[in-house]
Swiss-Prot record:
The gene is CYP79F2. One of its GO terms (molecular function) is oxidoreductase activity, acting on paired donors, with incorporation or reduction of molecular oxygen, NAD(P)H as one donor, and incorporation of one atom of oxygen. GO terms for biological process: glucosinolate biosynthetic process. It comes from Arabidopsis thaliana (Mouse-ear cress). Pfam families: p450. This is Hexahomomethionine N-hydroxylase.
Length: 537
């Protein structure tokens, strides 16, 4: 039976443990000090001094948000790579584009593992997904399935009609809000769009219950709202640097801070919506002869077979991977959309340039389509600049060293956790001139001339989508979702601050990196009334 203890109780236990071992501090340091010769050959990156055994863990526990601990420490150490010791686990943080490139190019194979964390275990259902599994045969299988089948050009082209339905529904929803004189919460609306597109591609429908409980104007039904809520609740458990992950071998079963339990509860709620759909579809395909054609990602997963005619992906693996898709697909486009529109309203000249490009490339006689995206370079430059300054998370998903290696000339022991800091790259004055200024034009210049803009940043000067062996496989669909949402927002409507929002400050929440106050806007149509589509369920 799992024991639950409060944060204060846990902290008292840890402090007691610290007092108990403090008496051996001097002795431990004497006997653990390596020779100077060995130090020069195996020097760790700079770091803060720590307690015996627990290392820097007490400092981490006492700092909230925990991501702030690393930012402050690296600033204090004046370094672009640092090492922290959490109860014997070396945690390496990186703020340098040069070292990040080394990590995901030259040392990619050495750093291709994932940490075994309690929260990640819950999401991956014991590490069954591509994103959570250790580097090995199972990871290779899931990655091959997703890259060659799920995210293939053929499959994404098949799903274009489904994505277009939700792009049209987005316009219909905003237009209905205008007709009712409603305030637009950009964050909420962006998440609804990301959710609806993901559900269409994954399950072939935006609703998760047979009751089909949603309105006829684009709003989510009660079940869908709850599904989306628990997806984000699960996502919010991920950035934690939870102490339980570093001391689980000592305190296994104790629910420190409640984070592990919160993650499990929310993951199970996500599954409670996903699994009935998956079970029903597995039965149709594998027991009742199937459907006339493969129509979505779920159909693709279920019908894949190996060279011997055996089903390639088990139902449990499908269920786990669907949870991972739900968690991975929605927040990045939604966060990018809110910050981009906020920056455009703060900088009207940038908004004017984006609208000018849309009017020249697409015009005002039809709605922008996916085929237009390749020609909307300024719009994509705005998305890139938002990724640079306003990332959706503090760190790239952690990598683990599979063997002893080096980074930046420092020794990295096997088992080290590697964290590349997104704000540390995108806002780094060593990489970017005037890094806090929002300037999309900086992404348009290639050898002095304008080039086609993509959202991928291969040089690791900022992170849009992670790269390397463990990199994001959804770059193409992520780009489509992001660019289409922004293009439809801008082409279809004129936006201005709602009177209740107050002055536009664009302040950032330290913990989540979201805009501190949700962006509330008023909206007016900018196209002919006949171009606004009706909602399609």
């Amino acid at each position: 039976m799992m024991m639950k203890i409060s944060f204060n109780t846990c902290f008292q236990i840890l402090l007691g443990f610290i007092v108990f071992i403090a008496s051996i501090t001097l002795l431990g340091r004497i006997f653990s000090r390596p020779s100077k010769t060995k130090d020069r050959c195996r020097q760790l990156p700079p770091g803060r001094p720590g307690w015996p055994i627990l290392g820097n863990l007490p400092e981490l526990i006492m700092t909230r948000p925990r991501s702030k601990y690393f930012h402050l420490a690296m600033k204090e150490l004046k370094t672009d790579i640092a090492c922290f010791n959490f109860a014997g686990t070396h945690t390496i943080t990186i703020n340098s584009d040069e070292i990040a490139r080394e990590a995901f190019r030259e040392r990619d194979a050495d750093l291709a593992d994932r940490p075994q964390l309690s929260i990640v275990e819950s999401i991956g259902d014991n590490y069954k997904t591509m994103g959570t599994s250790s580097y090995g045969e199972h990871f290779m299988k899931m990655k091959k399935v997703i890259t060659t089948e799920i995210m293939s050009v053929k499959t994404l082209n098949m799903l274009e009609a489904a994505r277009t339905i939700e792009a049209d529904n987005l316009i219909a929803y905003i237009h209905s809000m205008y007709q009712r004189s409603e305030t637009v919460d950009v964050r909420e609306l962006s998440r609804v769009y990301g959710y609806a597109v993901t559900m269409r591609m994954l399950f072939g429908r935006r609703h998760v219950t047979k009751e089909n409980m949603f309105s006829d104007d684009g709003r989510l039904g009660k079940a869908e709202k709850h599904h989306l809520e628990v997806i984000f609740n699960t996502l919010n458990c991920l950035p934690g640097f939870s102490p339980v992950d570093y001391v689980d071998r000592w305190l296994g079963g104790w629910n420190i801070d409640g984070e592990e339990e919160r993650a499990k509860v929310n993951v199970n709620l996500v599954r409670s919506y996903n699994n009935p759909i998956i079970d029903e579809r597995v039965e149709i395909w594998r027991e009742k002869g199937g459907k006339a054609a493969v129509e979505d990602w779920l159909d693709t997963f279920i019908t894949l077979k190996d060279q011997n005619g055996n089903y390639l992906v088990t139902p449990d693996e499908i269920k786990a991977q669907c949870v991972e898709f739900c968690i991975a697909a929605i927040d990045n486009p939604a966060n990018n959309m809110e910050w981009t529109l906020g920056e455009m309203l703060k900088n009207p000249e940038i908004l004017r340039k984006a609208l000018k490009e849309l009017d020249e490339v697409v015009g005002k006689d039809r709605l922008v389509q996916e085929s237009d995206i390749r020609n909307l370079n300024y719009l994509k430059a705005c998305c890139r600049e938002t990724f640079r300054i306003h990332p959706s998370a503090h760190y790239v998903p952690p990598h683990v060293a599979r063997q002893d290696t080096t980074l930046g000339g420092y020794f990295i022991p096997k088992g080290s956790h590697i964290h590349v800091c997104r704000p540390g790259l995108g806002r780094n004055p060593k990489i970017w001139k005037d890094p806090l200024a929002y300037e999309p034009e900086r992404h348009l210049q290639g050898d002095g001339i304008t080039k086609e803009v993509t959202l991928v940043e291969t040089e690791m000067r900022f992170v849009s989508f992670s790269t390397g062996r463990r990199g994001c496989v959804g770059v193409k669909v992520g780009t489509i979702m992001m660019a289409m949402m922004l293009a439809r927002f801008l082409q279809g409507f004129n936006w201005k601050l709602h009177r209740d929002f107050g002055p536009l400050s664009l302040e950032e929440d330290d913990a989540s990196l979201l805009m501190a106050k949700p962006l509330l806007l008023s909206v007016e149509p900018r196209l002919a009334s006949n171009l606004y589509p009706k909602f399609r369920p």
